[in-house]
A protein has these predicted regions:
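Glycan-recognition and catalytic cores of secretory/periplasmic carbohydrate-active enzymes
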Residues: 1-187
Length: 187
């Protein structure tokens, strides 16, 4: 088994596409997060900014997570100091949004009532809330970021959230005995 970080692709087909992903696609995806309020939602949840929660879905938090995952894998293949610093700034917003017990879903923390059809009136109330889906993408991003950089900043956020999930869900008395509603947290 060869770790992908030890593979160097140097051909006329994939190399330009990988470079385009690093220099165009990833920055464009992050700009969309900025434009559409994804980062603002974390800043609001973390008390760093005032304002209304933006977006149309309870799972909008996954957009930054998925892009962090891809950007981290890109960093692992070709280091980019600017991208690394940008990831640090985004991760700081995510960490600020995490509640003290590890909970992290911005539309719930921000009490976005117009999305309450998705999440209800309190944590873990509705199966279609996508809270665990959000967590699953957080975990994948955190692992990718840690593998790429060795930094624990997002990994520590993910572990704190996973510890909460393990306390809340399970077979024991007092725990929730429900499916996740959308696969990914179990990965």
């Amino acid at each position: 088994e060869v770790p992908f970080t030890q593979v160097r692709i140097q051909d006329a087909f994939w190399s330009p596409r990988i470079e385009t992903n690093r220099t165009v696609s990833i920055p464009s995806a992050f700009r969309e997060c900025e434009k559409n309020g994804r980062f603002d939602n974390f800043a609001i949840a973390g008390g760093l900014k005032e304002g209304e929660h933006r977006g149309d879905f309870s799972f909008d938090d996954t957009d930054p997570y998925k892009i962090i995952e891809g950007a981290s894998y890109s960093l692992a293949v070709k280091y980019d100091a600017r991208l690394d610093a940008y990831l640090d700034s985004v991760i700081a917003l995510i960490a600020a949004a995490q509640e003290s017990d590890g909970y992290l879903t911005t539309c719930v923390t921000n009490r976005c009532t117009r999305l309450s059809g998705w999440w209800g009136t309190h944590r873990w109330e509705k199966i279609n809330s996508h809270e665990l889906y959000n967590s699953g993408h957080l975990y994948e991003a955190a692992v990718a970021h840690y593998r790429a950089t060795g930094k624990r900043s997002l990994l520590d956020v993910a572990i704190k959230n996973a510890d909460l999930v393990c306390r809340v869900f399970g077979p024991d008395e007092g725990q929730k005995h429900v499916p996740s509603g959308h696969p990914i947290v179990e990965m």
